[in-house]
């Protein structure tokens, strides 16, 4: 969809501070240094974000875009991640939202604890922003949270504006600003909000406030751009089989707008962006993650996501350690997953990520490093709620190489050789006393089942009958 042609510019009544110099990204070029001038310049003017209501049957929509909560009392969380990277000033902003046990919208009463046992409840909004600084706002209540059953649309009101009624769905930007003092709303093509740090994270460098408005044009979902988009974890993700489930919603997009970070304004045009989500009873026991949308050495938009973890399968105490590498380049999707090949990893407790993968036709190698100390981020856990559980940086140095696979299994023609100094890197869970090295070890029966091509969405032609989230 041509977002600019379908929407009107949004007016901003608040006076804006001088913007950080982040010039329009009209042509790919070498990455700018991390330090950047704060003085405005006529040559760095950017386009305003534009708003359009989320269309039905939009292109590049992935399965599992919707909110998966089914209304039952089972332990449940859902989390969302949206990232914008600004190459011109080498800064990234990672927005993370979570809801825990939403059955208990006003928190748990004593009677609830007697019946269901103690649970952690609430809604959290976190941002890892410029210079790896952090902000977090949390409430134990989810009564002002909303999520669309079948589309990537959600929001929450922490504090309504002048006694206004909090929105219960997507609203135009001006209406949101008039009704919500502190909160957020996000769709596949629009994102806005304002949050204030609640003081619970003094152990990391903080900012006190963040405000943002930007529009997004999706470029990649999860699959070839001309094909039906894929479920990241296969068709079994439609059922509560894995703990947790995971879906990349937008492997790559281009975002335009502004972010005010503790009063400093960052403006951007066609900035690379990304979104993903997970849901279930709790996070994996241990995991690693690599993601990057800003590269040198390749033309067009390149998107990389690689991750692995130790997660529970089924109802028993069986665990598996799957790994995945997904690359979008020149409109094509290159997938390295357990049910079509192998993925190997060698991950240090911090500072070094090395992965390789192969499938029937291709080979890939990834190596990423960082000298940054990293910032502790929160994740929903069954044991303690939304607590520090992982460490991230957006200043990773990364090299991505991919080849065609020869008949003898060796490296053939090189398809991609690209580098970045803006990779997002993460390790989480634990323990991480030592490095973690291995090759994909997944249950053979599960691999055979997951690898079977099943279009789950086509089994539910009537939207009302589709499982939540699908």
Curated annotation (Swiss-Prot):
Induction: By salt and drougt stresses, H(2)O(2), salicylic acid (SA) and abscisic acid (ABA). Residues 14-48 are annotated as: Disordered. GO terms for cellular component: plastoglobule. Keywords: Chloroplast, Plastid, Transit peptide. GO terms for molecular function: tocopherol cyclase activity. GO terms for biological process: response to oxidative stress; response to salt stress; vitamin E biosynthetic process. It is found in: Plastid, Chloroplast, Plastoglobule. Residues 1-61 form a transit peptide. It holds the Pfam family Tocopherol_cycl. It comes from the Eukaryota. InterPro entries: Tocopherol_cyclase. Residues 32-48 have a biased composition (Low complexity). Expressed in the roots, stems, leaves and spikelets. Involved in the synthesis of both tocopherols and tocotrienols (vitamin E), which presumably protect photosynthetic complexes from oxidative stress. Catalyzes the conversion of 2-methyl-6-phytyl-1,4-hydroquinone and 2,3-dimethyl-5-phytyl-1,4-hydroquinone (DMPQ) to delta- and gamma-tocopherol respectively. Also converts 2,3-dimethyl-5-geranylgeranyl-1,4-hydroquinone (DMGQ) to gamma-tocotrienol. PANTHER family: PTHR35309, TOCOPHEROL CYCLASE, CHLOROPLASTIC. This is Probable tocopherol cyclase, chloroplastic. It comes from Oryza sativa subsp. japonica. The lineage of its organism: Eukaryota, Viridiplantae, Streptophyta, Embryophyta, Tracheophyta.
